[in-house]
Regions:
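C-terminal motif of bacterial Sec signal peptides marking the signal peptidase cleavage site
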Residues: 12-14
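Short, surface-exposed "cap/lid" segments of acyl-processing enzymes
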Residues: 43-47, 52-104, 109
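Alpha/beta-hydrolase active-site loop
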Residues: 115-143
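The feature captures the conserved acid-bearing segment of alpha/beta-hydrolase catalytic domains
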Residues: 179-180, 184-241, 245-251
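C-terminal catalytic histidine-bearing segment of alpha/beta-hydrolase fold enzymes
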Residues: 238-271
Length: 271
């Protein structure tokens, strides 16, 4: 038993050291884009954010990070979902919008008593997670005196952004990157277990039929194939303004951040 306890303590220490390293790297990325760190506390969880809040009464742009390192392997959840490469943060740092808020996902970079592996595995898109982000965004809207917001989500953060857009009336536009917007289609293609504790954005896609939205996908993305976003858009009834843009040569992580300002310029969202 002693060796087991020692091994557990060593694993926890290594996890803590890695989390600190990743947090320092994330802070450096954020500072390079003029974003300052802010730790938010809501619903028993600590959520790391970075923000640029110099303008008031403007459209608040909110970025939501991807799922991070949710699994160690197909059978074992990770003990720390912090992303090794925070693509969502890199996108936010490359975006000059002001005001802007970036939000990591629950238990990334920061731990708390409320952290449980279900929050980054089967319940990553649960009603509880959606409500948490609703609260964080509501508070940010008050801080900036904003009356509307735009949502940008990377990977699983794009699915969360879609769920938020379906539930809010102050969203001006939605942009996703490599997002698993149709969970049923995604688990079918990837041959994985359904996310039993999560809400599928595709089930209520009709709620955002008239919302301006652009879904970027990578031609060579094997994590979330382009057909997933296309399946989501097909769930939008009648006439809609949605677009699925397939970027040639891109995959799930490459090369979004490098050309993000140009991609934003091409779609012409109003901010």
């Amino acid at each position: 038993m002693r060796w087991l306890a020692a091994a557990l303590l060593l694993a926890l220490a290594c996890c803590s050291d890695a989390r600190t390293l990743y947090r320092n790297e994330a802070t450096a990325i954020a500072l390079s884009g003029g974003l300052t760190p802010q730790l938010f506390q809501a619903r028993g969880l600590n959520v790391l954010g970075f923000q640029r809040l110099g303008r008031e009464h403007a459209t608040l742009t909110v970025y939501i990070e991807g799922d991070g390192r949710a699994w160690l392997n197909p059978w074992q959840p990770s003990t720390d979902p912090t992303p090794t490469d925070p693509v969502g943060l890199r996108l936010a740092a490359a975006d000059p919008a002001n005001p802007l808020l970036y939000l990591a996902r629950p238990c990334q970079y920061e731990t708390s008593n409320g952290c449980d592996h279900h929050l980054w595995t089967n319940a990553r898109l649960s009603p509880e997670v959606v409500d948490l982000f609703q609260q964080l965004i509501d508070e940010a809207m008050l801080r900036t005196n904003s009356v509307q917001l735009g949502l940008v989500g990377y990977s699983g953060g794009g699915a969360l952004a879609a769920l938020l857009a379906e539930r809010r009336r102050d969203v001006a536009w939605l942009v996703t990157v490599a997002a698993n917007l149709d969970l049923a289609e995604w688990v079918r293609l990837e041959d994985i277990e359904p996310l039993s504790g999560s809400i599928d954005p595709a089930d209520d896609a009709a709620a955002i039929t008239r919302l301006p939205q652009v879904h970027f996908v990578g031609e060579h993305d094997r994590v979330v194939p382009p057909t997933v976003a296309k399946a989501f858009v097909q769930r939008l009834p009648g006439t809609n303004t949605s677009r699925v843009i397939v970027e040639p040569g891109f995959d799930h992580t490459c090369c979004w951040a490098a050309v993000w300002p140009q991609l934003l310029g091409q779609i012409g969202i109003s901010r």
